[in-house]
Amino acid sequence: MNIAIRNPVPIRREEGSLQVGLDPNDRIETAKVFAVYGKGGIGKSTTSSNLSVAFSKLGKRVLQIGCDPKHDSTFTLTKRLAPTVIDALEAVNFHSEELRAEDFVVEGYNGVKCVEAGGPPAGTGCGGYVVGQTVKLLKEHHLLEDTDVVVFDVLGDVVCGGFASPLQHADRALIVTANDFDSIFAMNRIVAAIHTKSKNYGVRLGGVIANRSAGTDEIDRFNAAVGLRRLAHFPDLDVVRRSRLKKATLFEMEPTPELKAVTDEYMQLAETLWAGADPCEAVPMKDRDLFEFLGFD
């Protein structure tokens, strides 16, 4: 089959925006699906890749989908910049029936399968469309039938209709944040987007992952105020920086007691999510209320 734009299901209006519903044929029904969001540069790809490894070490069959045009979500797993779905399709003039799975799926560390959706050139096209077509291509090649866990690593904190598209496929959305004003402010906007999407889709907030932070006091205070919970805490350790330079996951680095505490935390997070994290019924703050709420007296 060729990949083509299908007629969208009826359009709904949600709080002043147009939302196109998910085609029921494109639902991911055979795996637990997590979408990882957070402020740009907060460490979503690091978190996603190490979480994927943790799931794989639980014996799960894992697929990680990078949803950033930079296509750098999975390089610590694959040790290279994987070809994107868009690159693969362009190579066959968008005749998807000519593609083989190995043209766009790369097996990474500990058997984690990796896909980089890629995206249109900067300032053109819709990244969300690319994500949707990636899922369709995976289904056409029956690659989701042998998968237990799908992890979407989503671009920055963009919550437009395009890059909110992984929420249409996800069971749980996870938010990566640091213990600072900018990260929590971005988290609140993501909570608002997920709150809106959950009215029409099955996605629910799974919780918050504290990253690159010595403490979690501001995160915990915000969580208590809006109805979120912290699932894990990963401090800002130099081994994280070194693992990225080495193009490796934390599970591949030279073991130390400090590093073991981090990998154990990832394993605990994977176990919690696999067991089924209860949804958080969070209600976002108004921007001005949050501005007054955060910080010290």
Curated annotation (Swiss-Prot):
Question: In the record, which residues are listed under signal peptide?
Answer: none
Q: Where does ATP bind?
A: G41, I42, G43, K44, S45, T46, K70, N211, R212, P235, D236, L237
Q: What is its EC number?
A: 1.3.7.7
Catalytic function, reaction form: chlorophyllide a + oxidized 2[4Fe-4S]-[ferredoxin] + 2 ADP + 2 phosphate = protochlorophyllide a + reduced 2[4Fe-4S]-[ferredoxin] + 2 ATP + 2 H2O
One annotated GO molecular function: oxidoreductase activity, acting on iron-sulfur proteins as donors
Specify which residues bind [4Fe-4S] cluster according to the UniProt entry for this protein: C126, C160
Keywords for this protein: 4Fe-4S, ATP-binding, Bacteriochlorophyll biosynthesis, Chlorophyll biosynthesis, Iron, Iron-sulfur, Magnesium, Metal-binding, Nucleotide-binding, Oxidoreductase, Photosynthesis
What this chain does, per the entry, is described as:
Component of the dark-operative protochlorophyllide reductase (DPOR) that uses Mg-ATP and reduced ferredoxin to reduce ring D of protochlorophyllide (Pchlide) to form chlorophyllide a (Chlide). This reaction is light-independent. The L component serves as a unique electron donor to the NB-component of the complex, and binds Mg-ATP.
Q: What is this protein called?
A: Light-independent protochlorophyllide reductase iron-sulfur ATP-binding protein
Organism of origin: Methylorubrum extorquens (strain PA1)
